[in-house]
Amino acid sequence: MSVQHFTDENSATSYPVGDRSISADHQQWVCTTCGYNMIGEMPDICSFCGATHDKFVAWDEAEKIYRVTPHRVNDYVTQLLSLPRLGFEHAAYRIETEAGAVWIDCPSAFNRDLQPIEAIYFTHKDFLGASNQYRELWAAKVHLHALDARIPIAKPFPVDRPFEGDFTERGIEAFHIGGHSPGFTMYIYRKVLFICDYAFPPGSTMQLNPFGPQKETRDRAPRILEVISERSLETVCGYNFITEFDSWREDFKHLLDRAKSA
């Protein structure tokens, strides 16, 4: 499989869920520079990327402009991207499990006409997207590592399961890595690894994510290799790429070797 880069796709159980509609009075703003969603009154700057409020659009205006578009990865995984591209953009992934459909991470744009899912499993707090609105629309259960759920940027978003450690659910295996963010978690479902943005791009120029705590990111990276070293997988789904597993694993090994000798 060749590398595909896209161009233009606290427990909070007291929150109401499953209303199937979003109030017209709901205040939520989307940063068109990075795609971050801000709940409540419009702030002066984006707390994620620092863009000024002239780069924000209201959530319902964003719904009209940005269409979350599916791109098939295989028979059971679909990549979701906004068209046109919404800022930096990140991909979310829909998985058709035997126990129902779920997402890995969440689109930044809210589109109420998407096919419903039952749960959202997050790699980390950077890609919460419009998860609060999808949760309200479909009663989708939100899963985010407890260490990330308590970070200020994540606190406005309801989390149904602030998990800890590794777990398996619906056939999806979750592995707590840490590093790039305290709660960073990667997922494996059948033949697919969901690595998000821990290391990118695929190929000889791969690097560890340069944003966030560099030492922790480097120190925790071997945990990824431990998990995948004996796995017979086929595909790697990242925050802006889809690629073949064996070559990605070799590139990741070389990256860690370079990091050791640096």
PLM features: residue spans?
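A broadly conserved sequence feature marking short terminus-proximal activation segments
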Residues: 1-27
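Metallo-beta-lactamase
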Residues: 19-44, 52-55, 101-102, 150, ...
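Short Cys/His-rich micro-motifs in 6-15 aa windows
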Residues: 49-61
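Conserved beta-strand hairpin/beta-sheet module of binuclear metal-dependent hydrolase folds
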Residues: 64-110, 185-201
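Active-site-proximal loop/helix segment associated with metal-binding centers of metalloenzymes
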Residues: 83-90, 146-147, 152-156, 202-212
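Active-site HxH/HxHxD metal-binding segment of metal-dependent hydrolases
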Residues: 85, 107-169, 256-258
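Short amphipathic alpha-helical segments and helix-helix/interface helices
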Residues: 92, 110-112, 131-135, 221-228
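A general structural motif
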Residues: 99, 116-117, 139, 232-234
